[in-house]
C-alpha cells in the first residue's frame, strides 16, 4: 500500500500540473462534436412517433371568430387537430413569470397568464392557435394549411412608448395602457437635487435594438406519455432540466415526479431555450391523448416568430457632473418592450438587471431608474446573452463619451477620474449591490497598453492617407451575475473506477465537463480522465438552477467544493477503519488518506474500490458517494476594459473593425482556454448587434426581418483578431474566487464598437447613431452631415 501511495502521489502531482485549476485543458467533448458525433434533440426518435405542426396567426392583433378544423381532420394520415379549448379543458397552463417584481406603487407585476394556444385573441404574428398531429411531417404540414382561421383584425402597436400612451391598442383588459410593470429604483428627490446642482448634465436618447437568437439547432421537442405510471417525458433543449421540469409540472398540474426532462446537446441557447413554450405543452397533450410519441421541430422561418427575442429598450439617459468631471448622479428613464406575453424572466433584464448594472465601475453617488415594461403586438421577450448587463454598460459608456466631448475633457481622463479605487472596495454602489473585489484602473491601464493606444494617432494618419476614417474607443464594463441561489453537487464513485459528477447547471456550449473536472480533481486528487459529468436527465439531476447569468462556475464550483469536503469527511471515517486508526489521526492531501506522522496511507480511488468490494461495519460509510446542495452565494462582479479600432469607407459607409483588445478580471480562472472561447464568442455577438442585427416590424405588426435573408449575422470576415489580457482579482464571494465569464464579451463590445464608429465620424460632427450601425445608416449620416455643412 505504501509503494502504491507514493506512486499515486507523484502521478497526482503530475496530473495537477496538466489538468489542475488554471491549466488550458481542451474540452472533453470537442472530439465528439468536431467529428459530428454529437446528439442534438432532432437526432432522437421513438418507435411509432407521430409529427406535430403548429398553426399560427398571420395577424398581429385580432379577435378569433372561429377555427375550422374539419377539413384538416379529414386529410390522410391526420391523427388529430386541437385548439386552445381542448388544452383549456385539460387544465393545462397558464405560463407566468415568477420574478417578484413590483411597480413603484408596490403592486406586483401584472401577469398575462398565457395559455398554450390562443382562444379569444391573437396578439402577435406567430401566435399559436391550433396544432395538427399526423403520421408524417408532410401530412401534418398539409393538414396545418387546411385549418381555416377567421380572425377579425384589430389595430396593433409595436413600439413600447406608443403602446403606453392613452388610446393605444390594448392587448389585455386588465393591464391599463399595456404597462405590466412601472419599475422604479432610487431616491429621486436626492437624484434630482444632484442634477439641479450639477455644473454639467449630459443627455442621450438611445434605442437598444431588438435582436433574435439564431441557435445552431432550432427548438425541438419529443414527447411521450406512460399510461401505467401516468408520467410525461419530454426530450427538449434546455438550460437546466430541474427548473424546466418544475415549471412544466406546474403547467401540466401534476407533481414534479410525474415529469421527466431529457436534454442532450443543445445547439446554442443564449437564454432563449430556458423557458417552456406552448409547443411543448401541445405535444405532451397529444402524446397522452394518442398514446404514442409526438415530435415537433421548429424551422428557421418560424423560429424568428416563436422564439423569445432580446434587448428592445428605448432609453433616455442622463449623467450629472461637477465642474471637474466627477460624477454626481445618473438617471435612466424609458421603456422596455415585453412583446405580447410575459413568461420566464423577461421583465427582469428590461428593468431590474438594467438598473443593477448601470453604475458599472464608476463612483456614481446617486442613481435613479424609471422604466415602464410594456406589452406590444410583437414576439415575446426573454433573456438574451447578458440579460440587462450589456444594455446598462452601453448606456453608461455612451454617456461618458458624450460628456467628455461636451466638457472638453479627455475621454480617458474622465474615466480615470471616476473609477472606484481598490482601497474603496468593498464598495456599496448606488445600484444597490456591494462590489467585493476589483482593480478597475489597473485593468484599464493594461487595456491601453496591449492595444497600443498611444500610437493610435499615427494609425489614424495612415488610414486617412488611404481614404479611410479611423476611430478608437475604450470602454469598461462590470456585470452583476445571477442572484444568489442554491446548487446541486453530487459525486458518485462507480465500480469501474469512474467518478460521476452531477450538478444542476447544464452545458449548452460552455464546456462544463472540463473545468468542473479540473475543480474536482484538484479538490480530491481523483484522476481528471476518470471524471464524467452527468447532466440532462431530471431523474438524476433532481434539483438545481440551471445555467444562466454567468453563474455556472461560481454556483456549481461552490457545490463541487462543498461535495468534495463531504467526500473527504466520509473518506476519513472509512480510511480510519481500513488503516485501523483513529479518525482524528487521518489526514487528507493530494488524493491520499494518511495516518498523521506515518507513511501508512490509502489512495482515495483505492478506498472507493474497497468500499464497493466489501461490507463495512456500522458507523463506517459503505461508499464515498455524496448528494449535496450548497447554500446560496452572493453575486460575483466580472469586469474588464475593451478597446476597439475601426476604419470606415466614407464613400460606402462600410465599417471594418481593424483592431480589438480586451483585458478582463474574471477572478480565479479555472481554464483560460475555455474563457478565451467564451470571451471571443461574446464579443462577436456584441459586434453583431452593434453593426448588423435588428428585428423590425411594420406599423401593422408584420415582421419584416423574418429570415436570414433579412436578418444579418456576423460572418468570419466580420470577426477581428483579438488581443486578450487578464488582470484577475479573486472574488471573495465563493470558494474558488471565480467571477463568471460567459456574457462578458457582449457587455464590453456593444459600447466599444459603437463609440469607436462615432469617434471616426466625429470630424463630420456626428454625435449619435442608433444600433445597428449598418453601412447604410453610416453612409446616410455622413451625407446628412455634409448637407448641413453645405
Task: Locate each region found by the language model.
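Glycine-rich loop/linker segments at domain edges
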Residues: 23, 29-32, 98, 104-112, ...
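Conserved catalytic cysteine-centered active-site region
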Residues: 119-122, 255-263, 286-299, 303
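Thiamine diphosphate
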Residues: 269-291, 295-297, 512-520
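Short acidic, glycine/serine/threonine-rich loops at helix termini
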Residues: 92-96, 143-146, 236, 245-247, ...
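C-terminal catalytic domains of large/alpha subunits in multi-subunit enzymes
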Residues: 75, 85, 99, 107, ...
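Flexible, low-hydrophobicity surface segments
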Residues: 1-180, 619
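Short glycine-rich loop/turn motifs
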Residues: 50, 118-119, 217-222, 314, ...
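Conserved beta-alpha junction segments in alpha/beta enzyme cores
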Residues: 191-252, 345, 352, 471-503, ...
Amino acid at each position: 500500500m505504501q509503494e502504491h501511495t507514493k506512486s499515486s502521489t507523484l502521478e497526482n502531482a503530475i496530473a495537477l500540473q496538466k489538468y489542475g485549476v488554471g491549466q488550458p485543458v481542451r474540452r472533453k467533448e470537442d472530439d465528439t462534436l468536431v467529428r459530428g458525433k454529437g446528439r442534438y434533440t432532432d437526432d432522437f426518435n421513438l418507435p411509432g412517433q407521430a409529427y406535430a405542426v403548429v398553426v399560427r396567426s398571420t395577424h398581429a392583433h385580432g379577435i378569433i371568430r372561429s377555427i375550422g378544423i374539419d377539413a384538416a381532420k379529414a386529410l390522410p394520415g391526420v391523427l388529430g387537430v386541437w385548439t386552445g379549448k381542448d388544452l383549456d379543458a385539460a387544465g393545462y397552463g397558464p405560463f407566468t413569470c415568477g420574478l417578484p417584481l413590483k411597480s413603484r406603487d408596490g403592486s406586483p407585476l401584472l401577469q398575462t397568464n398565457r395559455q398554450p394556444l390562443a382562444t379569444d385573441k391573437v396578439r402577435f404574428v406567430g401566435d399559436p392557435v391550433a396544432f395538427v398531429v399526423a403520421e408524417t411531417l408532410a401530412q401534418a404540414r398539409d393538414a396545418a394549411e387546411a385549418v381555416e382561421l377567421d380572425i377579425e383584425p384589430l389595430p396593433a402597436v409595436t413600439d413600447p412608448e406608443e403602446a403606453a400612451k392613452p388610446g393605444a391598442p390594448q392587448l389585455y383588459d386588465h393591464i391599463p395602457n399595456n404597462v405590466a410593470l412601472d419599475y422604479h429604483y432610487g431616491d429621486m428627490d436626492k437624484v434630482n437635487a444632484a442634477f439641479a446642482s450639477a455644473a454639467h448634465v449630459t443627455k442621450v436618447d438611445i434605442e437598444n435594438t431588438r435582436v433574435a437568437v439564431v441557435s445552431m439547432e432550432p427548438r425541438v421537442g419529443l414527447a411521450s406519455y406512460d399510461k401505467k405510471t401516468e408520467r410525461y417525458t419530454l426530450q427538449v433543449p434546455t438550460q437546466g432540466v430541474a427548473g424546466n421540469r418544475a415549471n412544466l409540472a406546474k403547467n401540466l398540474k401534476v407533481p414534479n415526479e410525474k415529469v421527466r426532462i431529457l436534454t442532450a446537446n443543445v445547439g446554442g441557447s443564449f437564454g432563449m431555450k430556458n423557458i417552456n413554450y406552448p409547443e411543448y405543452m401541445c405535444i405532451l397533450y397529444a402524446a397522452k391523448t394518442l398514446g404514442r410519441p409526438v415530435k415537433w421541430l421548429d424551422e428557421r422561418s418560424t423560429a424568428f416568430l416563436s422564439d423569445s427575442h432580446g434587448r428592445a429598450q428605448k432609453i433616455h439617459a442622463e449623467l450629472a457632473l461637477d465642474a471637474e468631471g466627477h460624477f454626481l448622479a445618473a438617471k435612466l428613464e424609458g421603456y422596455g418592450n415585453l412583446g405580447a406575453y410575459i413568461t420566464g424572466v423577461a421583465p427582469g433584464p428590461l428593468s431590474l438587471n438594467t438598473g443593477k448594472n448601470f453604475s458599472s465601475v464608476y463612483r456614481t453617488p446617486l442613481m435613479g431608474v424609471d422604466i415602464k415594461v410594456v406589452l406590444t403586438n410583437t414576439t415575446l421577450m426573454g433573456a438574451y446573452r447578458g440579460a440587462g448587463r450589456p444594455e446598462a454598460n452601453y448606456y453608461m459608456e455612451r454617456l461618458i463619451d458624450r460628456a467628455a466631448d461636451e466638457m472638453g475633457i479627455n475621454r480617458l481622463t474622465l474615466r480615470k477620474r471616476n473609477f472606484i479605487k481598490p482601497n474603496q472596495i468593498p464598495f456599496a454602489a448606488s445600484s444597490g449591490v456591494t462590489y467585493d473585489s476589483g482593480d478597475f484602473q489597473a485593468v484599464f491601464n493594461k487595456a491601453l497598453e496591449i492595444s497600443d493606444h498611444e500610437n493610435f494617432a499615427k494609425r489614424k494618419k495612415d488610414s486617412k492617407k488611404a481614404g479611410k476614417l479611423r476611430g478608437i474607443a475604450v470602454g469598461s464594463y462590470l456585470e452583476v451575475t445571477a442572484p444568489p441561489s442554491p446548487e446541486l453537487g453530487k459525486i458518485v464513485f462507480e465500480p469501474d473506477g469512474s467518478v460521476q459528477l452531477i450538478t444542476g447547471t447544464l452545458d449548452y456550449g460552455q464546456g462544463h465537463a472540463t473545468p468542473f473536472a479540473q475543480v474536482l480533481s484538484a479538490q480530491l486528487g481523483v484522476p481528471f480522465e476518470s471524471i464524467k459529468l452527468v447532466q440532462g436527465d431530471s431523474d438524476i439531476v433532481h434539483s438545481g438552477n440551471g445555467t444562466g447569468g454567468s453563474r455556472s462556475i461560481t454556483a456549481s464550483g461552490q457545490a463541487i467544493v462543498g461535495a468534495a469536503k463531504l467526500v473527504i469527511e466520509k473518506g476519513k471515517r472509512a480510511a480510519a477503519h481500513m488503516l485501523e486508526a483513529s479518525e482524528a489521526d487521518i489526514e487528507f492531501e493530494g488524493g491520499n488518506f494518511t495516518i498523521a506522522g506515518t507513511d501508512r496511507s490509502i489512495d482515495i480511488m483505492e478506498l472507493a474500490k474497497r468500499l464497493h468490494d466489501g461490507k463495512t461495519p456500522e458507523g463506517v460509510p459503505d461508499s464515498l458517494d455524496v448528494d449535496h446542495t450548497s447554500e446560496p452565494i452572493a453575486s460575483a462582479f466580472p469586469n474588464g476594459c475593451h478597446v476597439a479600432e475601426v476604419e470606415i469607407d466614407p464613400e460606402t459607409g462600410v465599417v471594418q473593425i481593424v483592431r480589438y483588445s480586451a483585458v478582463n478580471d474574471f477572478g480565479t480562472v479555472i481554464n483560460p482556454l475555455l474563457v478565451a472561447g467564451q470571451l471571443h464568442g461574446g464579443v462577436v455577438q456584441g459586434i453583431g448587434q452593434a453593426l448588423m442585427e435588428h428585428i423590425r416590424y411594420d406599423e401593422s405588426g408584420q415582421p419584416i426581418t423574418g429570415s436570414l435573408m433579412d436578418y444579418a449575422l456576423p460572418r468570419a470576415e466580420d470577426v477581428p483578431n483579438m488581443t486578450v489580457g487578464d488582470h484577475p482579482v479573486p472574488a471573495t464571494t465563493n470558494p474558488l474566487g471565480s467571477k463568471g465569464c460567459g456574457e462578458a464579451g457582449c457587455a464590453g463590445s456593444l459600447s466599444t464598437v459603437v463609440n469607436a464608429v462615432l469617434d471616426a465620424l466625429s470630424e463630420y460632427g456626428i454625435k449619435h447613431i442608433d444600433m445597428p450601425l449598418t453601412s447604410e445608416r453610416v453612409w446616410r449620416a455622413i451625407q446628412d452631415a455634409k448637407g448641413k455643412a453645405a
